[in-house]
């Protein structure tokens, strides 16, 4: 039995029969019938000398609790730091190559991957100034640096939502009228017990003007949330406004995925990897709310009144500070890009 991802809560009550799906997995349980016999063999092995690890190391190991053990001899910058390395990683291992700096020239056919190998070998950034200039020239002021925080309930809590649907409860917005110009900060964090999405829509309408580029890091996420908001029971005027926003987005993640690579990014364009490198001193470390998971947990505590008043007030400030940091970070990333040209 598992959650039905197609289920939509249409009333105040959950339809349990529709929420869950029964699936026959008998055929997948067959291997488990051998567990008892395998345990006997494992007890025998446990008494013997530890065997050499012969398993191929894969990117999926990131989620394994034994990663540190199996990856003990892995180079600091490995072949798995090359973005989208895929099956080439297995081929390289068969040739005894784990260090990204040892990948032979021309081995990787992707131009992006080849550039990353060069960055790791030389220890110097790759900068495509022409493309960065084009990206910056495409920005239309005022700029709206925008970031959502969302919560996703396994069992839908609000009407017209499905399991694990992302529900916007907060956003931060920095507004800039010209390059390196002064910043105006706006923010929204839902207070109340209703569906936060409707108040979120009103705040978006209030703060985002009809013109200007909207900046996000990994903009697809923000665009998806906005498009989902437009499906709610709101006026046609509000729907049209929301649906006009996705086409205005520009993505800083795209720039650091294509036009600027630094060896200390270690192959990632995540803002948590990029920010400490290009903006030293600006970090999420030591923030009481320091990532999206923390933000989700914090909102749950506030929404369901799980804290004394003073603790709730402090947590609310911490939540606002975290989301503000996200959009301020994007401001600094764009400032950095201007400095590159």
Labelled PLM ranges:
Residues 3, 12, 16-19, 23-79, ...:
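Acidic, Mg2+-coordinating catalytic module of metal-dependent nucleases/exonucleases
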Residues 72-74, 91-92, 101, 153-156, ...:
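Short helix/loop capping segments that flank catalytic or ligand/cofactor-binding pockets
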Residues 78-143:
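N-terminal accessory regions of nucleic-acid-interacting proteins
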Residues 1-36, 185-296:
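Conserved DEDDh/DEDDy metal-dependent 3′-5′ exonuclease domain
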Residues 68, 148-152, 175-177, 192-194, ...:
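Short, flexible loop/turn elements at secondary-structure junctions
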């Amino acid at each position: 039995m598992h959650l039905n991802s197609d289920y939509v809560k249409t009333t105040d009550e959950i339809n349990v029969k529709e929420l869950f799906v029964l699936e026959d997995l008998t055929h997948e349980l067959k291997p488990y019938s051998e567990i008892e016999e395998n345990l006997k063999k494992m007890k025998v092995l446990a008494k013997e000398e530890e065997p050499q690890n012969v398993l191929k190391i894969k990117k999926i190991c990131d989620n394994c609790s034994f990663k540190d053990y199996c990856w003990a001899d892995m180079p600091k910058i490995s072949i798995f730091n090359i973005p989208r390395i895929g099956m080439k990683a297995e081929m390289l291992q068969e040739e005894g190559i784990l260090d990204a700096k040892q990948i032979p020239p021309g081995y990787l056919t992707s131009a992006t991957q080849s550039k990353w190998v060069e960055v790791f070998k030389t220890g110097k950034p790759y900068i495509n100034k022409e493309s960065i200039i084009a990206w910056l020239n495409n920005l239309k002021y005022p700029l709206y640096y925008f970031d959502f925080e969302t919560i996703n309930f396994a069992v839908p809590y609000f009407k017209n939502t499905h399991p694990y649907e992302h529900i916007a409860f907060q956003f931060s917005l920095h507004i800039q009228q010209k390059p390196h110009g002064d910043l105006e900060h706006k923010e929204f964090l839902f207070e109340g017990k209703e569906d936060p999405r409707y108040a979120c829509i009103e705040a978006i309408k209030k703060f985002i003007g009809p013109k200007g580029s909207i900046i996000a890091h990994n903009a697809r996420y923000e665009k998806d949330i906005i498009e989902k908001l437009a499906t709610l029971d709101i006026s046609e005027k509000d729907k049209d406004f929301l649906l006009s926003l996705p086409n205005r987005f520009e993505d800083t993640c795209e720039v650091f995925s294509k036009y600027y690579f630094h060896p200390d990014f270690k192959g990632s364009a995540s803002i948590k990897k990029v920010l400490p490198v290009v903006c030293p001193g600006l970090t999420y470390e030591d923030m009481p709310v320091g990532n999206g998971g923390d933000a989700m947990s914090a909102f749950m505590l506030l929404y369901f009144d799980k804290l004394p008043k003073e603790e709730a007030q402090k947590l609310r400030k911490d939540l606002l500070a975290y989301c503000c940091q996200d959009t301020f970070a994007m401001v600094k990333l764009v400032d950095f890009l201007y400095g590159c040209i």
